[in-house]
């Protein structure tokens, strides 16, 4: 739970209170949710229907040009180009929640994401394997925790971001299991998560090196509790 601090003073016979509620996660709550019967059932479904013994990569964000979804997809395409032995052995789950309609910049971004996913799936997909699963619908929290828990790799590459709670939620959901977190160095979480593989989404070389390293760089991730 967030740690709260507050200060109060009397101003013109009214009490004014300032409350500080730092942004963060609740690792114990996430772990308890992961271990619940309902989420364990969802994890089983993911492993049976999507993972099927493959390496599973999860990326969760919003449909936003600052979130680096298009850069991530192009890096994944390059991975499949240079690593044909991974065809059929890896699947990317891209969950990016669509923005409110009516804003052209976000509609253009969503269209670009959908077209890129379609092109990559059409280029590399087989009858028994689809390289990318995409959803732009909001996923219930229990289900996203299940995806985090089932995923071997979490890939978060915003061009610029604040703390980025997704990275810390993945760490909490994988507690005791290990995992690989590929994280943009332009997130606040990059300085509070031990064991993350840092990358630069503006650099093809850095992105390629990071995702090449991730499948063999399984580690016990830890987020500093001082930031929630």
Each predicted region: which residue ranges?
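Single conserved hydrophobic/aromatic residue that forms the stacking wall/gate
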Residues: 1-8, 12, 220-228
């Amino acid at each position: 739970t967030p740690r709260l601090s507050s200060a109060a003073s009397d101003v013109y016979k009214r009490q004014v209170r300032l409350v500080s509620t730092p942004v963060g996660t609740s690792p114990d709550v996430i772990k308890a949710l992961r271990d619940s019967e309902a989420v364990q059932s969802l994890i089983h479904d993911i492993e049976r229907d999507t993972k099927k013994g493959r390496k599973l990569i999860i990326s969760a964000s919003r449909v936003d040009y600052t979130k680096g979804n298009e850069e991530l997809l192009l890096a994944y395409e390059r991975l499949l180009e240079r690593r044909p032995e991974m065809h059929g052995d890896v699947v990317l789950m891209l969950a990016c929640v669509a923005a409110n309609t009516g804003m052209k910049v976000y509609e253009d971004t969503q269209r670009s994401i959908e077209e890129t996913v379609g092109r990559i799936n059409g280029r590399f997909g087989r009858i028994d394997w689809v390289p990318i699963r995409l959803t732009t619908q909001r996923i219930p929290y229990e289900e996203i925790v299940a995806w985090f828990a089932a995923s071997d790799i979490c890939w978060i590459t915003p061009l610029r971001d604040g703390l980025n709670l997704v990275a810390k939620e993945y760490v909490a959901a994988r507690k005791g299991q290990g995992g690989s977190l590929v994280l943009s160095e332009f997130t606040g979480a990059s300085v509070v998560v031990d064991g993350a593989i840092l990358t630069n989404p503006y650099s093809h070389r850095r992105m390629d090196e990071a995702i090449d390293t991730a499948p063999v760089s399984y580690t016990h991730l830890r987020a500093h509790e001082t930031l929630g």
